[in-house]
Amino acid sequence: MEHDRHGARQPERFNPERAASLNDRTRFDYLPPKDLISLLGLEPKGVLIDFGAGTGLYAIEIAALCPEISVLGVDEQEKMLEFFSENLAQSPLKNVQAVWTKDEQYSRLKKNADGVLALNVLHELGDRAMEEIQALLKPSGRVLFVDWNSEIERPVGPPQDHVYSPQEGRLRVIDFGFSVLKERKFPYHYALLCGLKN
């Protein structure tokens, strides 16, 4: 499924021609995967969906650090998943896979996720994509929104006027029916751990 852009802060999707920047492991220096895993607090045998996984850099690293969980990296851009699949081909991991949102397998993921990671995509997510995240979660599931902080000058990431401040991001997820359980700041990012409102 291709998501419309209604409600998104950034005017257009990430350009796959810039995908090489997503494979840069120095991203882990300012946004460590271990910290994201800790915030999500997944149980062994849990299912994590990396929503908007891009080239799979974080999905693959999290799968390597947590061999007891299943990691599914989903993306709506087929070109991104080609890069993801190339990266997977160089990995011996069996607990991670790439899933296209237009594939039948994606439709079977509804209400299957113990956790959803929405990394660097909140500013790109239209209303329909937010609904998709809700649909993927089990009733007790958690979603971790981690996005660029518009209040911080930084040498990387999208323009500041294309992303939210932590308060704006918080209001966005609350307005969409999530409850914020925990918040954290990183050098260039903010994180919101959320659950579904009862």
Model feature map: region roles:
Residues R27-K45:
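Conserved alpha-helix/loop element of class I SAM-dependent methyltransferases that forms part
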Residues D114-D127:
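A short SAM/SAH-binding and catalytic strip from SAM-dependent methyltransferases
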Residues I49, T55-Q105:
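Class I SAM-dependent methyltransferase SAM/SAH-binding core
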Residues A129-R142:
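A short glycine-rich, Lys/Arg-flanked "PGG" loop and its adjoining helix->strand segment in the class I
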Residues D4-L31:
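Class I SAM-dependent methyltransferase Rossmann-like catalytic core
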Residues Y106-V116:
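A short acidic, Gly/Pro-enriched loop at the edge of an enzyme's catalytic core
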Residues C66, L125, L137-P139:
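Helix-to-beta-strand junctions that scaffold the AdoMet/dcAdoMet cofactor pocket
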Residues A20, T26-R27, R142-L193:
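C-terminal alpha-helical "lid/dimerization" subdomain adjacent to the S-adenosyl-L-methionine
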